[in-house]
Amino acid sequence: MIKHLTACFAGTPAKRPAMHMLLALLLLVAMPLWAAEPKELDWPALIPEGAPVVPPQLTPLHDMSQLSNALSAESAPPARQQAPDAPVVKSLDGQQVKLPGYIVPLEVSEEGRTTEFLLVPYYGACIHVPPPPSNQIVHIFSEMGVRVEDLYQPYWIEGKLQVRASSSELADAGYQMEAEKIYAYELR
């Protein structure tokens, strides 16, 4: 085989078509490997250029006298979403992506795994603070799921992103994804 390859690259005019054919074949085989690598996104990439950026409403409790109000808020109806119809980046539709974030469970199995959840940019979104704009929420479906007790850490989610709105009891999402990989986010 090596002898045959060396002969192809020897440079004689009669053997150049074989060399071109071999190179074309190698490119065809290697292209899907490059294409399979997901595009790493951050949360600002989900906001269209020129669209207003809505800062998160993170209201920490500094005054202990407000503690009873906060505890009663836990049983109150969910806070209103900041921008339920925020614009989305249509060019991301169908792209293979990788996005870090926190998991907000929508469905939990008897085994304690969530297989349908919202991916959000910061911890506590939709639960302790109002939901972020819809273009900052991805509705995730996953066969493998994530254990509920592991929800306090951020995760990388990989899969094909769809620009498709969805609604849940907690918030509206501007994107959806069928998770192909879920793994812990670690600082570099």
Model-predicted regions and their roles:
Residues 4-22:
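Bacterial N-terminal signal peptides that target proteins for export
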Residues 35-188:
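OB-fold and OB-like single-stranded nucleic-acid-recognition modules
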Residues 2-9, 132-136:
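Charged/polar, low-hydrophobicity segments characteristic of intrinsically disordered regions
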Residues 30-32:
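N-terminal signal peptide c-region/cleavage motif recognized by signal peptidases
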Residues 22-28:
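Hydrophobic helical h-region of N-terminal Sec-dependent signal peptides
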